[in-house]
């Protein structure tokens, strides 16, 4: 049988992505916490299918069942490669943004793509913080980046551009800034510097 290796599109793909991310054994409860947008029963059925196909190993100790990726399976290298797509995407974003003038003082992916809870209809959210008050110099770059990101991922990208002072002024009025501080995936700059910018502590 051909194993199902589509990341983040099916229960099977989500399970494989989680298992490929660490050489560890996972209980159903742990997988459920890592994949909160999937039902427990759906994850249970996916594990049963993947064990039957041989791509996932099941270990039983008393009443506890744990699961791990069968890394000797011929499909395992491809699954691991798919699981690393987020890291590669962030690296490509960073390389692109480092070529801008001026560079963002902070950039981060946020929303479902940062939390690992994307669905087939999700888009990708990115915040870019400009060092100056006038962000117009970035307009062409932002449009080009949105197009490139969709080519890289097949997903539309929503880009939130804010000036440094605008972030400071809006920190108490924009809940999205707190969401980014909590769940964001930094591309340029550090999360601690962003938290300080919005008046938090880290």
Regions found by a protein language model. Give the residues of each.
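Short beta-strand->loop micro-motif that forms the acidic, two-metal-ion catalytic signature
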Residues: 126-129
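Catalytic core of pol beta-like nucleotidyltransferases
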Residues: 1-103, 115-121, 131-202
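Short helix-loop-helix/strand-helix junction enriched in hydrophobic and basic residues
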Residues: 106-114
């Amino acid at each position: 049988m051909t194993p199902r290796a589509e990341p983040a599109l099916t229960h099977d793909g989500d399970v494989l992505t989680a298992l490929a991310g660490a050489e560890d054994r996972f209980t159903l409860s742990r997988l459920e916490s890592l994949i909160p947008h999937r039902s427990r029963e759906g994850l249970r059925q996916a594990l049963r299918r993947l064990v039957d196909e041989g791509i996932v190993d099941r270990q039983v100790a008393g009443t506890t069942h744990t699961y791990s990726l069968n890394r000797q399976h011929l499909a395992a290298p491809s699954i691991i490669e798919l699981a690393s797509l987020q890291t590669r995407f962030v690296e490509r974003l960073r390389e692109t943004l480092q070529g801008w003038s001026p560079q963002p003082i902070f950039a981060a992916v946020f929303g479902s793509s940062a939390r690992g809870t994307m669905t087939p209809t999700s888009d990708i959210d990115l915040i870019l913080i400009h060092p100056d008050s006038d962000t117009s110099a970035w307009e062409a770059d932002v449009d080009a980046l949105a197009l490139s990101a969709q080519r890289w991922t097949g997903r539309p990208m929503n880009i939130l551009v804010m000036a440094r002072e605008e972030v400071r002024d809006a920190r108490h009025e924009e809940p999205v800034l707190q969401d980014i501080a909590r769940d964001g995936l930094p591309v340029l700059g550090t999360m601690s510097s962003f938290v300080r910018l919005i008046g938090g502590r880290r």
